[in-house]
Amino acid sequence: MALRLLRLVPPRVGGIHTSVQFKLQYGPLAYILGEKATKKMTEKSKLITVDGNICSGKSKLAKEIAEKLGLKHFPEAGIHYVDSTTGDGKPLPVQFSGNCSLEKFYDDPKSNDGNSYRLQAWLYASRLLQYADALEHLLSTGQGVVLERSIYSDFVFLEAMYRQGFIRKQCVDHYNQVKKVTICEYLPPHVVVYVDVPVPEVQSRIQKKGNPHEMKITSAYLQDIENAYKGTFLPEMSEKCEVLQYSAWEAQDAEKVVEDIEYLKYDKGPWLDQNDRNLHKLRMLVQDKLEVLNYTSIPVFLPEVTVGAHQSDQVFQEFTELPGRKYRAGYNEDVGDKWIWLK
C-alpha cells in the first residue's frame, strides 16, 4: 500500500512542469563524468544521530549540534514524515498514513485492532525513508547531517512493546525480518550521541509537558526503552561507530558536545572502507525511494499489517481523489499544473 501511494506523491509546488520522466537526476553517466562523492567530503561530512528516551531533550541538542557545526538537521521522523516532505507538506488522513495513531497507542497500547505494531512498522518505514534522505543529502552535497533517532535505534521501542505485552511474538519476528533485509543496505552513523535521563526525570518532564496522551505512559515502558538502549543498542553501535554518552545535565552544554565530536578519531566502522564506487551504489539506492521502501515488503501474513485486496484498492482510489494525486507529478490540473498537453 505504501508503495502504491508513494508512486503518485507530487512535488510541493504546482506550475509549468517539464516532463518528470526526463528530470535530471544523478546516475551512472554522472558518475562516469566525474560526479564523485569523495570529492565533496570534508571533515564535517558526518552522519550524526542523537538518541535518548522520550522527553530526554534530544531534539534541542540535535538542533544545536547542527547549527554549531553547520550541518543539516533532520527532526525526528513521525507518522506523517512522507506527507511533510512531499506534496503540499500537510498531513494526510490516517488511512493514507499507515492507518495508525500514536495517541491511540498511548491511550490503549493493548488495543486488539493491531494499532501498536502497525504504528511501529510504519515508523520504521518512515525512519528508513528519512535515513535514505539524509544519506542522499550527505552524498550529493557533502554537508553533514544530524538526525533524531534512526533505523538503528528504532528497535528499542519494539522491545519495550513486546516486554510490556503490547504486541505478539509474531510481530517481533516480522519486524526483525524486515530490519534484516533493509538495514544491511546502509552505512551506520559516524557518531551516536546518547542522552541518558533517568526514568523518574523522564516522567517528570512528561508531566510538565502536559500532553494528555503521553502522560499515560508507564514507568515500566520507559524503563524497558532505557534497558534496550543500554543493554543492546549502545554496545552494538560502539563496535560500528563513535558513541558519546551524556547525562541530562551534561547534554545542556551543546558547546562541550560539539567539542567532543570534533575531537573524535573516527578510526572504526564501515565508512573507513568506502570508496567512490561503493558510495555511488549507495547513492543510487537512497535516491530511489520506491526501491528503499520495497525492502520493507516481505511475503508474510500478519493480521496487524496485512491489507486485503479490495480494501487496498478502495484506499488507493480514495487517495487518487485527493488534490494533486490523481496523475503523476506535474500532470494534475487541479493543483495548478499547466501545459499538460505539451508534456
UniProtKB/Swiss-Prot annotation:
It comes from the Eukaryota. Accessory subunit of the mitochondrial membrane respiratory chain NADH dehydrogenase (Complex I), that is believed not to be involved in catalysis. Complex I functions in the transfer of electrons from NADH to the respiratory chain. The immediate electron acceptor for the enzyme is believed to be ubiquinone. The modification N6-succinyllysine is found at residue 110. InterPro entries: Deoxyribonucleoside_kinase, DNK_dom, NDUFA10, P-loop_NTPase. Residues 1-23 form a transit peptide. The modification Phosphoserine is found at residue 238. CDD domains: NDUO42. One of its GO terms (biological process) is mitochondrial electron transport, NADH to ubiquinone. Pfam families: dNK. It comes from Bos taurus. Belongs to the complex I NDUFA10 subunit family. This is NADH dehydrogenase [ubiquinone] 1 alpha subcomplex subunit 10, mitochondrial. Its cofactor is FAD. The modification N6-acetyllysine is found at residue 110. It is found in: Mitochondrion matrix. Keywords: Acetylation, Electron transport, FAD, Flavoprotein, Mitochondrion, Phosphoprotein, Respiratory chain, Transit peptide, Transport.
